[in-house]
């Protein structure tokens, strides 16, 4: 989000490519109030967010809010204002979605964008995503429409009353966010339409509601379509991380060749904090803040902290990425 020179060349840095902001409906702290950055309360929250980003150890973050880029837009706008705190880290735009899939869960999917992506491209990206059932482009209005379309039985599962969503837009928006699913083909199409390679598919694998939930033997075409098209996967299993980047280990040796054959070519594997608050509680994996990687599964990338640096790591994932407390080279 800011231009800097990196005279020391590529070096190992912590990257947290999965954090949320107060714009995310699933946020553990104080959420944004309606009105955008023009609200004084929201401005204070953004300043608190900037302070937390600067204080935490990672050099790079990606804001992965559910269904929206509002957190990203608010951060960008605040940084342009007089008197804004200075952001000392690299922040990428991102979004977290749920895909319609042959699973018992709502399949988790992300997209990461360059920090130089124009706002209009992000708006166009959302308009290409199709919300299942109502067949509308993703928007707040679409989420509210979905909530008012689905049955009362489905709403009850989430503790929501039908009458509430009929008469309260905020409750309808929340309900829609809880149940919405995006058409998978529209997800792929939306990524492909982003110009200049500024969007990267990012699939959780064995983390929460990830692709591993799909029974690939029964739904091979669906599984393989996402398995091969996603340049980045999220995993906290070290043997599986090694299999993604192309490294055979004693723990993955039995299935490594078939895994790589299905994958097509090595992919970058990362582990994000999935932070839903600015500052977490030490030792509590359920209350992780920015840079609080679970169980010391820290993502390290040896590249400049830029979008081009990320692309370089995607091309050379084995030698430019590591998940763990510290890369061996830094232990020497």
Tell what function each PLM region has.
Residues 1-59, 69-123, 127-129, 206-332:
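Charged catalytic cores and adjacent phosphate/nucleic-acid-binding surfaces used
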Residues 53, 70-73, 161-164, 193-194:
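A broad, low-specificity signal for short, low-complexity segments enriched in glycine/proline
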Residues 65:
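Nucleotide-cofactor and metal-assisted catalytic machinery
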Residues 114-185:
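Low-complexity, serine/threonine/proline-enriched polar segments
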Residues 180-192, 198:
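Internal active-site segments that recognize and position negatively charged phosphoryl groups
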Residues 192-195, 223-225:
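Short, conserved, surface-exposed binding loops centered on an aromatic residue
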Residues 193-213:
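Aromatic-lined carbohydrate-recognition surfaces of secreted/lumenal glycan-active proteins
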């Amino acid at each position: 989000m800011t231009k800097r020179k990196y005279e020391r060349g590529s070096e190992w840095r912590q990257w947290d490519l999965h954090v949320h902001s107060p714009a995310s409906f699933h946020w553990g702290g104080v959420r944004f109030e309606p009105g955008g950055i023009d609200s004084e309360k929201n401005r204070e929250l953004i300043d608190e967010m900037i302070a937390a980003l600067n204080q935490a150890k990672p050099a790079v973050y990606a804001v992965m809010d559910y269904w929206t880029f509002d957190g990203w837009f608010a951060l960008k706008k605040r940084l342009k204002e007089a008197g804004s705190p200075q952001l000392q880290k690299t922040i990428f735009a991102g979004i977290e979605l749920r895909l319609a899939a042959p699973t018992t869960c709502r399949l988790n999917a992300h997209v990461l964008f360059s920090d130089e992506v124009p706002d209009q491209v992000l708006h166009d990206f959302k308009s290409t995503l199709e919300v299942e059932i109502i067949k509308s482009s993703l928007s707040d209005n679409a989420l509210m429409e979905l909530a008012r379309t689905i049955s009362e039985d489905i709403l009850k599962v989430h503790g929501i009353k039908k009458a509430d969503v009929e008469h309260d837009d905020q409750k309808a928006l929340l309900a829609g966010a809880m149940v919405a699913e995006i058409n998978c083909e529209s997800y792929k199409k939306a990524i492909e339409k982003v110009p200049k390679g500024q969007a990267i598919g990012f699939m959780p694998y064995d983390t929460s509601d990830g692709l591993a939930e799909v029974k690939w033997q029964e739904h091979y075409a669906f599984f393989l379509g996402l398995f091969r098209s996603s340049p980045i996967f999220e995993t906290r299993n070290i043997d599986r991380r090694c299999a993604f980047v192309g490294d055979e280990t004693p723990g993955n040796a039995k299935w490594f060749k078939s895994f790589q054959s299905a994958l097509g070519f090595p992919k970058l594997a990362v582990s994000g904090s999935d932070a839903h608050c600015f500052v977490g509680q030490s030792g509590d994996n359920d209350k992780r803040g920015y840079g609080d990687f679970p169980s010391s599964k820290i993502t390290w990338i040896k590249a400049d902290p830029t979008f081009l640096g990320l692309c370089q790591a995607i091309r050379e994932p084995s030698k430019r990425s590591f998940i763990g407390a510290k890369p061996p080279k830094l232990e020497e």
